[in-house]
């Protein structure tokens, strides 16, 4: 099953690099740093605990599980409006002979209206999950970024399509078997028992490691990485982690490192991380 969202650091394309290390049998799947949930949707576990500290992200997954008919209906209405606006924009642009004149795109206004709702500046008739999905699919480069006031401030991405077909009934059905939580990862670690399997994709040891997360504006620093490594060593279940290779992560995980592979990033936002990096596969089994 495909993941639903655009998500920086998503693992969809990397799964072939580490799938052989995932156990064939386990009782419950646990993912404390859910993000785009590529591995969760790929494995399709019947029982799961999925968690992220990003409240708006978790509200989206909760709406997919609990309010799917309304979510689908709201997104369908927005897609019709988006497509209608796009057709009008293309018509007006083709009709304008002076190519130096900027042709209005009504989807730009729609985007900023939805962004104001997302930020709580104006009242919203939509589910939080609807707002999150719309912003995720139409913001520039799928970025998540907040200003000092805690307001999402990514500009309109000017995409031709706003595709709601990615979100399916199958996603809703799979999420029925999941506990969806919004807490610190350590609380999730404490829920693990010996026949669980945990997949970990934590923030990396780099300068740009908050993943646009409002709850992590100071980043996931060295102290946090050392806390995570210690907690990893004390886990009660089998666990596999993917993390960027740096001197710090090599020090922290040492003998737990199973292999490494090269990762090419398609977007180098603000020149804050390398377009090419090495990722390591870490296991406790």
Protein language model annotation of sequence segments:
Residues 39-44, 172, 190-193, 248-255:
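Short loop/helix-cap segments at secondary-structure boundaries that form the rim of catalytic
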Residues 33-38, 167, 243-247:
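Short, polar loop motifs at secondary-structure junctions
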Residues 1-24:
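Class I SAM-dependent methyltransferase Rossmann-like catalytic core
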Residues 146-159, 204-224:
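Mobile active-site "lid"/loop adjacent to the S-adenosyl-L-methionine
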Residues 18, 29-43, 47-55, 133, ...:
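Conserved proline-anchored active-site loop of SAM-dependent methyltransferases
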Residues 166-199:
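A mid-sequence, solvent-exposed acidic-amphipathic segment
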Residues 205, 213, 218-285:
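Long, positively charged, glycine-interspersed low-complexity recognition regions
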Residues 46-176:
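Class I S-adenosyl-L-methionine-dependent methyltransferase module
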């Amino acid at each position: 099953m495909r993941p639903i969202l655009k998500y920086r650091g998503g693992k969809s394309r990397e799964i072939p690099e580490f799938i052989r290390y995932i156990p064939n049998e386990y009782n419950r799947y646990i993912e404390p740093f859910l993000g785009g949930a590529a591995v969760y949707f790929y494995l399709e576990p019947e029982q799961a605990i999925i968690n992220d500290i990003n409240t708006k992200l978790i509200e989206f997954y909760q709406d997919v599980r609990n309010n799917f008919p309304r979510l689908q209906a709201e997104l369908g209405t927005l897609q019709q409006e988006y497509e209608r606006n796009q057709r009008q924009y293309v018509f007006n642009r083709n009709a304008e002979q002076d190519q130096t004149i900027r042709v209005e795109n009504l989807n730009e206004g729609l985007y900023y209206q939805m962004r104001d709702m997302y930020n709580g500046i104006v009242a919203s008739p939509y589910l939080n999950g609807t707002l999150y999905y719309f912003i995720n699919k139409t913001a520039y480069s799928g970025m998540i970024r907040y200003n000092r006031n805690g307001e999402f401030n990514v500009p309109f991405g000017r995409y031709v399509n706003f595709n709601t077909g990615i979100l399916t009934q199958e996603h809703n059905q799979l999420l029925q078997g999941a506990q969806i939580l919004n807490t610190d990862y350590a609380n999730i670690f404490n829920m693990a028992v010996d026949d669980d399997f945990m997949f970990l994709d934590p923030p990396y040891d780099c300068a740009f490691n908050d993943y646009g997360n409002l709850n992590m504006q100071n980043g996931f620093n060295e102290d946090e990485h050392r806390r995570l490594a210690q907690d990893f060593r004390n886990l009660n279940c089998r666990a596999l982690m993917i993390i960027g290779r740096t001197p710090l992560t090599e020090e922290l995980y040492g003998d737990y490192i199973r292999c490494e592979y090269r990762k090419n990033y398609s977007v180098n936002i603000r020149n804050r991380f390398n377009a090419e990096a090495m990722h390591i596969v870490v296991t406790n089994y």
